[in-house]
Amino acid sequence: PLLAQQDENGVYGSADLIRGMTIMGPSGTYAHYLIIGYLNYFGLTIDDVNYVNMEYPQAMQAFELGDGDICCMQNPNVYDAKQQGYVSLGDPAVVAPMYENLVCSGKIYAEDSDTVVKFLKVVYRAQEDFLKDDKLAAEWLGKYYEKVGYQASEKAVMDEVQNQKPLLSLAEAAQVPVGESLVDTAKFMQDLGLIEESQTKQVEGNVCPDLLKKLCEESGVEWKQ
């Protein structure tokens, strides 16, 4: 029944279908954050479902044995799950967008911000190269997985590159509020009781868009924040 309804954004489900379901995944992680975003998308909260705290391998094992209704997975296992007939319920970028954040120490920010801007320039140049060349992106993503001990087939890596590109060009980054997802994550952790409100405010106070703005100005990219 859950797969019977898909909206214009490609997201499966409805409030009536999801309410009361058992969802398995690790608490306090992006998977948990994503599930909350998915529920909020349909006007629900985590209290409307039975969320079971389980690590990815245990959740997947239980799911394969027939337990639960929805299971959280992480790359590169998402591709393999699709090959087994499992269905992704929606694009994370639609229900709970999350962008990685680059951070630096307060010392280098205060004393050598020009070096940070140069670093940002290199990062976005690499990302734009990856966005232009799927094979290049897959090659380096595969190297990353190998380095951290993940086993991923070439097909799984390419699927992630082609269907779940989490990279932004500099022009795209100029339109995304700097630190927004970081602050949202802090609020999420606060709601779980993992950090205090004062720590969330500290995160908010440490968001500094000025260096990215400077890079955009130097690169002739319009700043739209």
What are these regions (language model features)?
Residues 112-196:
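Secondary-structure end/capping motifs
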Residues 58-147:
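Pocket-lining segment of extracytoplasmic ligand-binding domains
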Residues 183-225:
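Conserved C-terminal helix/tail region of periplasmic/extracytoplasmic solute-binding proteins
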Residues 40, 45-47, 87, 147-153, ...:
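Short coil/loop linkers at secondary-structure junctions
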Residues 1-61, 65-67, 75-83, 106-111:
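A conserved helix-loop-strand patch within extracytoplasmic ligand-binding domains
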Residues 10, 23-30, 51, 55, ...:
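Extracytoplasmic/periplasmic, Sec-exported soluble proteins
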Residues 64-68, 165-178, 211-219:
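Short amphipathic alpha-helical segments at helix boundaries and their inter-helical linkers
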